[in-house]
From Swiss-Prot:
Binds 1 pyruvoyl group covalently per subunit. This is Arginine decarboxylase proenzyme. InterPro entries: AdoMetDC_fam_prok, ArgDC, S-AdoMet_deCO2ase_core, S-AdoMet_deCOase_pro-enz. Is synthesized initially as an inactive proenzyme. Formation of the active enzyme involves a self-maturation process in which the active site pyruvoyl group is generated from an internal serine residue via an autocatalytic post-translational modification. Two non-identical subunits are generated from the proenzyme in this reaction, and the pyruvate is formed at the N-terminus of the alpha chain, which is derived from the carboxyl end of the proenzyme. Specifically catalyzes the decarboxylation of L-arginine to agmatine. Has no S-adenosylmethionine decarboxylase (AdoMetDC) activity. It comes from Hyperthermus butylicus (strain DSM 5456 / JCM 9403 / PLM1-5).
Amino acid sequence: MAVQQNVKKGGREAGGDLIVGKHVYGNLYGVDEEKLWDEELLKDIVVEAARVANMNLVDIKTWKFTGFHGGVSVIALVLESHISIHTWPDYGYATVDVYTCGANSDPWKAFNYIVLKLKPRYYIVHYADRSSIPGYTESEKR
C-alpha cells in the first residue's frame, strides 16, 4: 500500500520556463570496508551532505544486506530530489548519486562532502544537466 505524504512547497523551483535539474553521480574505489558497513555513519554523512548542499531533508531510509556481496544502501528524499549511497564493502566500492531540482541547492557540495568523509583512494564523477529547454512544451513533442 502506498502512503502519500504532503510536504511543504518550494523545494522544486522553476526559473521561468527552465526547470533546473543538476545530477552529480559517481563511483568511489578503495574505501575503508568498515565505513562501508557502518549504516549509521553513512546515514549521518548523507544527512550532513544534504545540509551543506542547501537541501531540505524529507525522509531517509537505510538497508543493510549481509553476507558476501552485501552492503548498505542509504537513500534520502529531499524536497529538491534525492541523495543515495550504495556500498559493496567486500570490494571497497560505493556509488553516490545526487540529483537536485531548483537553483538553490548544489549537488556538487553534497557529492564532494560524501567523498571527503569516505576518503576513497580514487573516484570517478559524472555530471548531467537535466534541465528542461526554455519554451519547449509537451505539445511540441508530438
